[in-house]
Swiss-Prot record:
One of the GO biological process terms: DNA replication
Name of the protein in its database record: Segregation and condensation protein A
Keyword set includes Zinc-finger: no
Function: Participates in chromosomal partition during cell division. May act via the formation of a condensin-like complex containing Smc and ScpB that pull DNA away from mid-cell into both cell halves.
Amino acid sequence: MYEVKLDAFNGPLDLLLHLIQKYEIDIYDIPMKSLTEQYMQYVHAMKQLEINVASEYLVMASELLMIKSKLLLPQHDVDDNLEEDPREDLVGRLIEYQNYKEYTQLLTEKKEEREHYFTKHPTDLSHLEKNVTWDECQTLDLTDLIVAYQRVKSRLALNKPKTVEIIKESFTIQQATEKVTTQLRHHTSFNFFSLFTFSEPIEQVVTHFLAILEMSKSGVINIEQVRSFDDIRIIRGVNFNIG
């Protein structure tokens, strides 16, 4: 015999909450008869499979049966001092556990999100400090003060850790190389800017650029540019395989 958690539930409250959500039960008005029956079915199933049911599940089973029996008592047999709903304590614990699960899930998601970020330590800018004498300050006007304020803001921003999100590469250099090769099999030359639209991410533009640099170094293509900032012309190189 061995001990397991029922269907991977983390204790009896987790099992009860699962049943409440599965059968869409109002947590503030629990029908004890049906909920107890569903709960006991889980416990009996484990016993039939000769699985050693943890004692906490059996304690909860006893509590459910007790609450159920109190609700079944005729009204005139109920103790006059018993004013509270016998389900009240159980409902309170279930709500508290439900909140705990929701917060745990939220923290888990935040932890996973944070793992995609790396923090850079502030840059040391102490070497940029400049001592200003009082005589120099006397010549300042409002415009100088505004400029100084903007400079202070910029320096403070540099002292803050810079957080950069690392995005998984979705367009590889290999894909860009194949795209260039396909173009050159149909045309002896073409313009670099025709490879993409300017609505595409900058990462994809950079990937294309790295691809043509690699192809140029290996002699697969030649690249030409008439003037600075003009479009780059991509031409078949001596090692280009037209296939």
